[in-house]
């Protein structure tokens, strides 16, 4: 696998943004249940991408990337729910990238 891996890099950046968002929500709104779900699914994406990269077979790679995709869908759900229940403001739920 190439050293320059866009999916690996973006999933790490996304996980960092999710951790920062979790800290913000839990410190500002004292909300822990929904934001914990967001933290778990949002950081799991990158973990599964890393596992896919180190996979033992093409089938293992595909399976792990599919899990990462499912975690991304779940993360999208938690973000929408937090936004719809006013734990996230419109300006907050569109966060800035962690790297240029």
Features from the language model and the residues they span:
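N-terminal first-folded block
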Residues: 2-45, 49
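DHp/HisKA dimerization-phosphoacceptor four-helix bundle of two-component histidine kinases
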Residues: 9, 40, 63, 67-70, ...
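Short, solvent-exposed, charged loop/turn and helix-capping segments
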Residues: 21-25, 51, 82-91
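Acidic/His metal-coordination segments adjacent to aromatic residues that form catalytic metal sites
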Residues: 48-65
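Mid-chain, well-packed structural core segment of small domains
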Residues: 60-89
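Conserved small/polar residues in nucleotide/adenosyl-binding loops
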Residues: 92-98
